[in-house]
Amino acid sequence: GNIGESLDRKRIVSSVMEAFGRIDVLVNNAGVAPLVRADLLEMSEESFDRVIGINTKGNMFLTQLVAKEMLNQEKLFKKRGTIINISSCSAEVSSTSRGEYCVSKAGVSMLTKLYADRLAGEGILVHEIRPGVIATDMTSKVTEKYNKLIDEGAFPIARWGQAEDIADAVSAFADDHFLYTTGNYIDVDGGFHIKRL
C-alpha cells in the first residue's frame, strides 16, 4: 500500500493486528525521492506534495495509528513498543536539486522528537536512523556522483553503505539495549556527518 493514503495505513495496521495481536516494533522505512531532480527554484508543487505526503505525512499518521495500538498492549521486556524512523543525512544536509526530499526528512527528524516526547512516559521508545549514501534503487541513478565523492574522501569510511548496515542499526534499537534513551538518532553514513577541514 501507499502510506501516504489514510485507507492504506489503516489496512496495514489492522492486518498486522489481526495476524499478531500486537505491534512491538514499527520501522518507518517507506520513502520516495523526487521523480525529477530539479533546482529549488524549479521544483513543482506536485513533486513537493508527493514526497512530503509519503515521507512525512505517511510517517506521522502511521505512527499515530501504531502508537494507539501500542498504548493498549501490556509491556514486554520493560517497554510497550519501539518506533524507528528512517530519515536521512539529508535531514540536515542541503541538496538544492531535491529540496522536497531534504524538507521531508527534516520533518521525520522532528516527528521522532515529538513522538518520543509524547510516548516516553507510556513505555514506547522512538529512535531515528540517518542513513548516508546507501546502495539502493533510489541511489542507482547517481552512482557516478557518489563514487566520485567516495574517491575524493567525503566519507571517512570510504565505501557505499549497504542495506545491511541500516538493518543492523534497526536491530540494535529494536532490541532491549537502549531502554534509557529516546528521541535520539544515529548516523549510519560512513562518518559523512563529521565536519572536516
Regions found by a protein language model. Give the residues of each.
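Short C-terminal tail/terminal secondary-structure segment
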Residues: 37, 153, 171, 182-197
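Substrate-binding pocket helix/loop in short-chain dehydrogenase/reductase
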Residues: 37-40, 44-49, 151
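Active-site helix of classical SDR
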Residues: 63, 104-107, 112
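Residue(s) in the substrate-gating loop at a strand-loop-helix junction
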Residues: 88
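Short, small/polar-rich loop/turn modules that mediate ligand/substrate recognition or access, typified
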Residues: 120, 125, 181-183
